[in-house]
Swiss-Prot record:
GO biological process: mitochondrial electron transport, ubiquinol to cytochrome c
Name of encoding gene: MT-CYB
Protein family: Belongs to the cytochrome b family.
Organism ancestry: Eukaryota, Metazoa, Chordata, Craniata, Vertebrata
Self-association state and partner proteins as the record states: The cytochrome bc1 complex contains 11 subunits: 3 respiratory subunits (MT-CYB, CYC1 and UQCRFS1), 2 core proteins (UQCRC1 and UQCRC2) and 6 low-molecular weight proteins (UQCRH/QCR6, UQCRB/QCR7, UQCRQ/QCR8, UQCR10/QCR9, UQCR11/QCR10 and a cleavage product of UQCRFS1). This cytochrome bc1 complex then forms a dimer.
Name of the protein: Cytochrome b
Positions of heme b b562 binding: 83, 182
Annotated cofactor note: Binds 2 heme b groups non-covalently.
Cellular localization per UniProt: Mitochondrion inner membrane
Needed co-factor(s): heme b
Molecular function per GO: metal ion binding; ubiquinol-cytochrome-c reductase activity
Length: 379
């Protein structure tokens, strides 16, 4: 009798992806985030499903339905907070995963990388629409501000915004369609993640050295299954600490006030994981320019393979590039801080400098440093 692992069509796919997959022997904990993202996605889909059972996507009852979930549904408060804070964990893992890809030159797997960028955009869109659903003040005004940005598109902008709204302002139609999109997108993300994995398994994983590891492979199971389980436990620990002790730490108090179109909150700001992009958007005084900078701040990732000038793939043996990478990290943290601050002196100029630094580092300084390092290799 042939082994089911090698004969059954479905089991064979699972086996080749998670059990007998040849993996480099030296991949570090930075390679854990892929599996953690998968866990986050499954967790978000499950908690989201149970929330959708009790949620109503109507402007009159949306806010009350969230209150009902938290007060009356068995463990509803827990499901709601796991979903809200699960989104934060999702983005922490996402940014770590992308940062790992940048540091170790994983972007040279072009298909995998580009699908990853599409995934990033899709997850961001999903999170934005999810934030609108509780229909609090920040939900309503966040939706108004961000959808309004599309009106900066020449000629079709205004029509496009009204088409997305389903009216002349963010209202009942907007909330209903956002709920529909928020429900469907995670399944699209799941399909994209499978394609992401498919392309990755065509080439095999990268490793910290950036050198081919074909000569030194080990089976994924048990070595990396146990490692992923450890990562999952740590993720669960971090998430449950947030959920059970400080569930509202990362949220906005304004969202506990029902949406009121007649009363604008003093500081409109998105969730923390969008603040860096929001800071870049605000740092340009022109509406269209700001929108372009906002989109380019993420889209610039697709240029990474073209901007790679080094003879080495990874930054492991490139100390100058490492310095710039960590400056970029600090710059993104600075932008995140600025995005949460009011638009006044000195925050405006700090935000503008941080935004310029962001694009300068990626487009000019890092490629130039790579070329200098190439010349140093000749010594």
């Amino acid at each position: 009798m042939t082994n089911i692992x090698x004969s059954h069509p479905l089991v064979k796919i699972m086996n080749n992806a998670f059990i007998d997959l040849p993996a480099p022997s030296n991949i570090s904990s930075w390679w854990n985030f892929g599996s953690l993202l998968g866990i986050c996605l499954i967790l978000q889909i499950l908690t989201g499903l149970f929330l959708a059972m009790h949620y109503t996507s109507d402007t009159m009852t949306a806010f009350s339905s969230i209150t009902h979930i938290c007060r009356d549904v068995n463990y509803g408060w827990m499901i709601r907070y796991i979903h809200a804070n699960g989104a934060s964990m999702f983005f922490i893992c996402l940014y770590m995963h992308v940062g790992r890809g940048l540091y170790y030159g994983s972007y040279t797997f072009m298909e995998t990388w580009n699908i990853g960028v599409i995934l990033l955009f899709t997850v961001m869109a999903t999170a934005f629409m999810g934030y609108v659903l509780p229909w609090g003040q920040m939900s309503f005004w966040g939706a108004t501000v961000i959808t309004n940005l599309l009106s900066a598109i020449p000629y079709i902008g205004t029509n496009l915004v009204e088409w997305i709204w389903g009216g002349f302002s963010v209202d009942k139609a907007t909330l209903t369609r956002f709920f529909a999109f928020h429900f469907i997108l995670p399944f699209i993300i799941m399909a994209l993640a499978m394609i992401h994995l498919l392309f990755l398994h065509e080439t095999g994983s990268n490793n910290p050295t950036g050198i081919s590891s074909d000569a030194d492979k080990i089976p994924f199971h048990p070595y990396y299954t146990i490692k992923d389980i450890l990562g999952a436990l740590l993720l669960t620990l971090a998430l449950m600490l947030l959920v059970l002790f400080t569930p509202d730490l990362l949220g906005d108090p304004d969202n506990y006030t029902p949406a009121n179109p007649l009363n604008t909150p003093p500081h409109i700001k998105p969730e923390w994981y969008f603040l860096f992009a929001y800071a870049i958007l605000r740092s340009i005084p022109n509406k269209l320019g700001g929108v372009l900078a906002l989109v380019l701040s993420i889209l610039i990732l697709t240029l990474m393979p073209l901007l790679h000038m080094s003879k080495q793939r990874s930054m492991m043996f490139r100390p100058f590039s490492q310095c710039l990478f960590w400056i970029l990290t600090a710059d993104l943290l600075t932008l995140t801080w600025i995005g949460g601050q009011p638009v006044e002196h000195p925050y405006i100029i700090i935000g503008q400098l941080a935004s310029i630094t962001y694009f300068l580092l990626i487009l000019v300084l890092m490629p130039m440093t790579s070329m200098i390092e190439n010349n140093l290799l000749k010594w």
